Amino acid sequence: MHGPHPTVKDIELSLAPEDVPVQCNVQLDEEDYTNVEEPAQQAYRVVTLCPKCSSPLRLVVECSHADIRALEQLLLGTLTVVCPRCV
């Protein structure tokens, strides 16, 4: 509509929304969601002393670099590993 007053010829009554194809059952390829990259696992040997009898303890864990850092923080904090004889 142009001008100060609308006229009948400016009004369209046959407006309809465009047809848009909608696919509701779209499935992803298996590789799209199974290729989540896991952090690299590596074996780490932890050697410490039993806090009760001072005997050496050896612990082998397999984890990511971030997880071994978390274990290190736990061992430096309040977590203690004791030998089976001292339990």
Curated annotation (Swiss-Prot):
Protein name (Swiss-Prot/TrEMBL): Protein E7
Assembly and interaction partners: Homodimer. Homooligomer. Interacts with host RB1; this interaction induces dissociation of RB1-E2F1 complex thereby disrupting RB1 activity. Interacts with host EP300; this interaction represses EP300 transcriptional activity. Interacts with protein E2; this interaction inhibits E7 oncogenic activity. Interacts with host TMEM173/STING; this interaction impairs the ability of TMEM173/STING to sense cytosolic DNA and promote the production of type I interferon (IFN-alpha and IFN-beta).
GO BP term (any one): symbiont-mediated suppression of host innate immune response
Region E7 terminal domain: start-end pairs: 1-38
Zinc-finger ranges (unnamed): 50-86
Keyword Metal-binding attached: yes
PTM per Swiss-Prot/TrEMBL: Highly phosphorylated.
